[in-house]
A protein has these predicted regions:
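Conserved NAD+-utilizing ADP-ribose enzyme module
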Residues: 1-55, 60-69, 76-141, 360
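Structured loops at beta-to-helix junctions and adjacent beta-edge loops in soluble globular domains
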Residues: 21-28, 92-94, 195-197, 311, ...
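Residues that flank catalytic or metal-binding motifs in active/ligand-binding sites
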Residues: 67, 87, 188-190, 261, ...
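Short beta-strand scaffold positions
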Residues: 72, 265-268
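C-terminal, surface-exposed recognition/capping segments
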Residues: 268-362
Length: 362
């Protein structure tokens, strides 16, 4: 069993956090893990075998296999096992224990956990306890994820306003004009801003040639040239934008404080880093929609579908990234319908966009 982590570096809490472990009971009465079939002892520390992996910073591989013990942090999953009569045991990840969290925030994987000395039994009190415990666990993880994704006082999930100021989720008020959300930082610390809205469309009609070719996985995850690529695509196809819906949606996107042409179709590396941080972005979107009193004010990043990038792999294929496992980025036919979400990203030659983003973060 593997976990596909959203955090590149292990998280470490300064307090104990509660999780829930699904187990199975054999005919001989022994208790085992359901996937690796490892026998465990209730009331004892359960330590993982193997070495904790080191994930690459470019997120080209987010798969966590050996070196960790899996458990659930999703309330719905834990309660479902409990209601079906499955064995669920409360467990604790002790303070200072390294752990990773699943992209969709359903599972956690730590180097060790301490199992409770008895199974959970179904009751209203138990259900309430599970909900309270996991709400607390999720909030601890959320704060750790924001801390790990902070640069110069700005965090992934912070709001960018139309007046170019930046506001943390806790400081948001209804009268603020939010235009985007910080989605990741480049190697030099420059923040990328993802739009509040998205659409589903094809990348474009088939052509005889490609404009922005990157034809290897290794190069695609290091590709942060979305502004340049968008500019080149626009210069090539500006007289036939209707044939390239993904490009058209991004270059025509505008908000209060921005104009058409300020937003771009991100490159593969930019899109991959954005969807990796989907949980932090979506938490901020939930808060924004709640404060605005409009559930459709901003669109959440969707788990499952793929997001188009401006990076091409050939005349008939382009790159797209999903919100799941390590395999969720690759080449797809340009006629396929995927999700498109504009961003404010830096390009080496796009001086207009460069000055705009620098003004944002003075």
């Amino acid at each position: 069993m593997c976990l596909y982590s959203q955090n590149i570096k292990p998280l470490v809490a300064d307090t104990d956090i509660v999780v829930y472990k699904h187990l199975v009971k054999r005919c001989n009465g022994n208790v085992h893990t359901p996937h690796q079939d490892t026998q465990v002892t209730l009331g004892q520390k359960f330590v993982a075998k193997g070495k904790l992996p080191k994930l690459p910073k470019n997120y080209s591989n987010n798969k966590i296999g050996e070196g960790v013990i899996h458990a659930y942090i999703d309330k719905t999953t834990a309660k479902s096992y409990l209601s079906q009569g499955e064995i669920i045991v409360k467990a604790v990840i002790k303070a200072d224990t390294p752990f990773f969290v699943q992209v969709d925030m359903t599972e956690i994987a730590a180097t060790e956990i301490v199992l409770d000395d008895d199974f959970q039994t179904y009751s209203e009190e138990t259900v309430k306890e599970i909900e309270d415990n996991l709400d607390n666990t999720i909030n601890v993880i959320y704060k750790l994820l924001r801390e790990q994704n902070t640069h110069n006082g700005v965090s992934v999930g912070d709001y960018v306003l139309s007046d170019k100021s930046i506001v943390a989720p806790d400081a948001l008020t209804k009268n603020m004009d939010v235009i985007g959300i910080i989605s990741f930082f480049t190697k030099d610390g420059t923040p990328n801003v993802t739009a509040l809205k998205q659409t589903e469309c094809i990348w474009g009609r088939l052509t005889d040639f490609a404009v922005n070719v990157v034809n290897s996985l290794e190069k695609s995850v290091e590709d942060f040239n979305g502004a340049d690529y968008t500019k080149k695509l626009y210069e090539t196809y500006k007289d036939r934008l209707d044939d390239f819906p993904a490009l058209k949606y991004c270059v025509e996107y505008e908000t209060k404080g921005t104009k058409k042409g300020d937003w771009v179709l991100g490159s593969n590396g930019e899109v991959l880093q954005t969807v990796r941080n989907a949980y932090l972005i979506n938490r901020s979107i939930e808060k924004l929609n709640e404060v605005k009193g409009d559930c459709g004010y901003a669109d959440k990043i969707i788990t499952g579908p793929f997001y188009w990038a401006s990076t091409e792999s050939g005349s008939i294929t382009a790159w797209a990234c999903g919100t799941g496992s390590v395999g969720d980025y690759g080449w797809y036919g340009k006629w396929v319908g995927n999700v498109v979400r504009p961003s404010l990203a830096l390009g080496k030659t796009d001086t207009g966009l460069l000055s705009y983003v620098k003004r944002l973060f003075k």
